[in-house]
Design a protein with these regions (language model features):
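Non-catalytic membrane-proximal stalk/linker segments that position and tether the catalytic domains
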Residues: 2-68, 73, 79, 84, ...
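A recurrent flexible, glycine/aromatic-enriched loop bordering the glycosyltransferase active site
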Residues: 148-177, 377-378, 441-477
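A conserved acidic beta->alpha catalytic loop
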Residues: 76-78, 113, 328-338, 372, ...
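Glycine-rich, basic loop-to-helix element that forms the pyrophosphate-binding segment
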Residues: 101-103, 370-387
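A short, conserved alpha-helix in the catalytic core of glycosyltransferases
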Residues: 177, 188-233, 260, 406-411, ...
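Conserved donor NDP-sugar-binding/catalytic core segment of glycosyltransferases
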Residues: 118-149, 176, 226-227, 399-446
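Short aromatic/hydrophobic "clamp" motif used to bind/position activated sugar donors
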Residues: 107, 392
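Short, acidic, metal-binding catalytic loop of nucleotide-sugar glycosyltransferases
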Residues: 59-65, 85-95, 312-321
């Protein structure tokens, strides 16, 4: 019964926000949604023998054939896995060697035991002229039934990469780029002797350090190039350690935070990096040293109690330089009485009726009257005309605040170079996710080109690959 009530509440919320037409489109989409198993997916995406042979013929005709040096992570005394070698020998593209080679144009990293898809090197080689760093999807055997679990990765996402190494332990980097960027030492840390690695006595920590060195190389690479490619195809199969020791994660996450902090310092970013043990990831909180003025714009029609809860939440913020602009739209007289109480100074500004006052000692409040019919975009744009802040927060009147640092978090992100918009995770009243980011092209939505992620997910759950709980760039598939 509780689940039904929650769905009804979310349905009414969707209807209120998007209107009748989109509500029924969403209802139809929900009825059509269905998933497929990984086995079914593989059947749909597997190459035929004919296609594999065509790749071999095509590669033979290439004038420029990039050569791969394959670096296999293993213990010194450990033999190379026959499965890994066989997968290399079965490639439709045969320009590779596990030995150091002066002709190598690309370096491919593998863990001992990894199995490459037959078309892996060919697919990567096709992209090699355009990209300096290439990663791809993979799967891992992680459960008791030895069933592989796929990891479908997003396109290059800087914020997500700073929380976890979603590129993984198998990726490709161009040799020429390594030299130009001056990263030979970082590469030698992986392929040769490494002081930190040699000093570690614990076997499990050594394994973690090997993977950390790969992550460090990735972070250093992205500081020097934006030519980063993602191949949306599963090109490598990993044999995962099913009983990963806690010692591994304690060491790995500590080192990861250190590397991310160093990376952020090199990039001139101000942030606090902490460990998220539950997510086995890092949390990066960007901050500003100066609290520049923030204007919070809230369209409103009646709903005094709802608006009051929203204002009470804003009042608790620990940000000390902000203003609230309520854009009034055709409310009744009782609502105007409420406006007079919270903003008693009434005046006409450029022909617009306004009310001004103080919500608290550090928060100014202003009500501006929009007398035309409801249009959400026009209401917000109208409110901006009266804003004095450097940053704008566009807020619905039914939003209640959970914490006190949300403006600090948003302004910290917006202050960064190349960031124009920042958003927050929203919950419905029943503690399910309203949205945890927006993605372009998801599900082929009939309502537009983008959709909310993880709608309806219980608050205590983290979603696919923890994406509902990790900071990431919106719009990335």
């Amino acid at each position: 019964m509780k689940d039904i009530v929650s769905k009804v509440i979310r349905g009414f919320h969707f209807l209120r926000c998007y209107g009748v037409k989109d509500f029924f489109v969403r209802l139809r989409e929900k009825g059509e949604e269905q998933g497929i198993t990984y086995d079914e997916w593989k059947k749909l995406h597997s190459l035929t023998e004919k296609q594999l042979q065509e790749q071999k013929k095509a590669a033979e005709s290439w004038v420029n054939k990039p050569f791969f040096r394959v670096v296999i992570e293993k213990e010194l005394e450990e033999e190379i896995s026959p499965a890994t070698l066989k997968s290399l020998e079965n490639q439709t593209y045969d320009q590779w060697s596990i030995e150091e080679n002066e002709q190598a144009a690309m370096i491919l990293f593998l863990k001992n035991g990894d199995v490459l898809a037959e078309h892996a090197l060919y697919t990567i080689a096709c992209l090699s002229d355009e990209k300096d760093l290439i990663y791809y999807d993979d799967d891992k055997i992680t459960d008791v039934n030895n069933e592989p679990v796929p990891f479908f990765k997003p396109d290059y996402n800087l914020d997500l990469l700073r929380t976890e190494n979603y590129f993984g332990t198998s990726f490709v980097v161009k040799c020429e780029f390594i030299e130009k960027a001056g990263l030979q030492e970082k590469l030698c840390n992986i392929t040769g002797k490494n002081r930190i690695y040699e000093e570690i006595q614990n076997r499990i920590q050594k394994a973690a350090e090997r993977e950390i060195q790969l992550y460090e190389l990735i972070l250093c690479c992205i500081e020097h190039t934006e030519r980063i490619g993602h191949i949306s195809d599963i090109l490598v199969h990993h044999m995962e350690n099913k009983n990963m020791d806690p010692i591994y994660w304690d060491y790995y996450l500590q080192r990861q935070c250190e590397l991310v902090e160093q990376h952020l310092q090199r990039m001139g970013e101000k942030a606090k990096v902490t460990v998220e043990n539950q997510l086995q990831a890092c949390s990066v909180q960007y901050y500003v040293t100066e609290h520049e003025r923030v204007s919070i714009i809230i369209p409103n029609k009646d709903e005094i109690e709802v608006l009051q809860k929203c204002l009470d939440g804003i009042k608790k913020t620990n940000y000390d330089n902000c203003e609230i602009i309520i854009v009034e739209n055709n409310s009744c007289k009782d609502t105007f009485s409420f406006y007079h109480r919270i903003a008693p100074e009434e005046e006409m500004v450029h022909g617009v009726q306004t009310f001004q006052g103080k919500l608290s000692h550090n928060i100014d409040i202003k009500v501006v009257v929009w007398e035309n019919e409801f249009n959400y975009s026009k209401l917000n744009n109208f409110g901006v005309q009266f804003a004095t802040g450097k940053y704008y927060i566009f807020l619905n009147n039914d939003v209640e605040m959970i914490g006190t640092d949300w403006i600090l978090r948003l302004s910290g992100d917006c202050h960064r170079n190349k960031v124009g918009v920042a958003g927050v995770k929203l919950y419905y009243p029943d503690d399910t996710v309203q949205h945890a980011g927006i993605v372009i092209g998801i599900g082929g939505s009939k309502r537009g080109i983008a959709a909310n992620m993880f709608q309806g997910l219980p608050r205590e759950e983290h979603g696919y690959q923890n994406r509902a709980s990790l900071q990431a760039e919106n719009g990335r598939r």
